[in-house]
Amino acid sequence: MANKMVGKGKLPVESEDAQKLRFQAELEFVQCLANPNYLHFLAQRGFFKDSNFINYLKYLLHWKDPEMAKYLKYPMCLYFLDLLQYEHFRREIVNAQCCKFIDDQAILLWQHYTRRRTRLTSLGTTSLTGLAVGGQPVGGGVQGPLLSNEPLPMANNNNNTNSTNANNPQAPGQQQQQNGAPMIQQNGLSNNTGMSGGVMGSGARDGGGVNLSGQKVS
């Protein structure tokens, strides 16, 4: 279908088929710019010295818009499209050594980017799985050094002792003496002597209790 003229001196209105064809041609050409060897090919044949071709490269900048860029399979082409806007780059890309250097750097970038992206994705998945709310992991995740640098809470003997006393209430006389054995207290730690007179947990002796300082208690 032929293009229709809107009026005298006006640009023709493209038909739907013509717009589709132009879209496909631009999409293919823009993505070819991701290949440094293709840029070297164009430079050797003098395309980058043609003012019309340079204007066309400026026109192609509309592919950087999100609505157009979403169709690109090789987004690296937009980086080279920006470089082609500079005369210095258009002049240097004709050099084979420059082209080889850019090609090698692009390959290294893709290799390291893939590895780095895989590693970051793996760490991100672990962080989301072990995301803590109120100090507790959600979804069965395990918190590790990568997820939290906060020190682990230390055990509080005073709280444990108070909790034990609260769960097992006793009369004041019973707390101080149980089964005829005195209560020994040092540094806030209570140690109850057993029937044999030894300190509960360590230092048991027959016939008398031993406090935490090693002195014998009758």
Curated annotation (Swiss-Prot):
Q: Does the keyword Nucleus apply?
A: yes
Assigned keywords, A-Z: Activator, Nucleus, Transcription, Transcription regulation
Q: Does the keyword Transmembrane apply?
A: no
- Where is there biased composition of kind Gly residues? 195-211
Give GO cellular component annotations, separated by semicolons.
Answer: mediator complex
Query: Where does the record place it?
Result: Nucleus
Give the Gene Ontology MF terms in alphabetical order. transcription coregulator activity
UniProt record, GO biological process: regulation of DNA-templated transcription
Region: Disordered; residue ranges are 142-218
**Pfam families reported for this sequence:** Med31
Specify the superkingdom. Answer: Eukaryota
Regions of biased composition (Low complexity) lie at: 155-187
- Its predominant location is nucleus
Q: Which family does the record assign?
A: Belongs to the Mediator complex subunit 31 family.
Q: What does this protein do?
A: Component of the Mediator complex, a coactivator involved in the regulated transcription of nearly all RNA polymerase II-dependent genes. Mediator functions as a bridge to convey information from gene-specific regulatory proteins to the basal RNA polymerase II transcription machinery. Mediator is recruited to promoters by direct interactions with regulatory proteins and serves as a scaffold for the assembly of a functional preinitiation complex with RNA polymerase II and the general transcription factors.
Tell me, how does this one assemble?
A: Component of the Mediator complex.
Protein name, entry field: Mediator of RNA polymerase II transcription subunit 31
What is the species of this protein? Aedes aegypti
